[in-house]
Amino acid sequence: MKLKRHGQKGGKVDIEGILDNVEKFKPLISDHVGWSEEKGQLHPSTIDALIRIGVPRFFLPSGLGGYEITPIECARVTEAIADIDASAAWFVMVFNAARLAGAAWNDEVIEMIFRENPDTLLSASGNSPYQAVEKEDCYQIDGVNHFASGCRHAEWMLSPVRLENELATVLLPMNDCEILDDWDSLG
């Protein structure tokens, strides 16, 4: 499959090229909708298609290989993907919401996560804060997060954490987390 390069137009990524690539992946993504619904997670081929479309790079700085598209452009792509697979469109939102949160991170953290692989996937959750207890030179983080979209495909988990009497945000490597397979969206 030949994909359009996301060429720059006056310093901006060609959003029409991204939308063309969504259309090219339409058959592959739609072929796996049933599997994804049955398994409660996106099919690996769908995740691969989203990466090849460029989803993880939407809000990433251009210096790290990102596209720096606008929220409106992201919404256009998300809408096009939702026409194929609503669950895949949800992941577009989740993966990019975590990147938007990254705008507040220091450069060291951003470099650590994205320098080697701008397609690194982050899962995010805004509920069920973990509990952090300060130790000698670190924090011990514990808890259960009852809802974390994209966690099976992500390398990092972004979540709220309670530090004594204040809320903060924690970024955890997924290989330090255990996924409990108890999600049933219908109840």
Model-derived regions: residue spans:
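Glycine-rich flavin
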Residues: 44-52, 57-154
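DPxDG-like acidic metal-binding loop motif
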Residues: 144-183
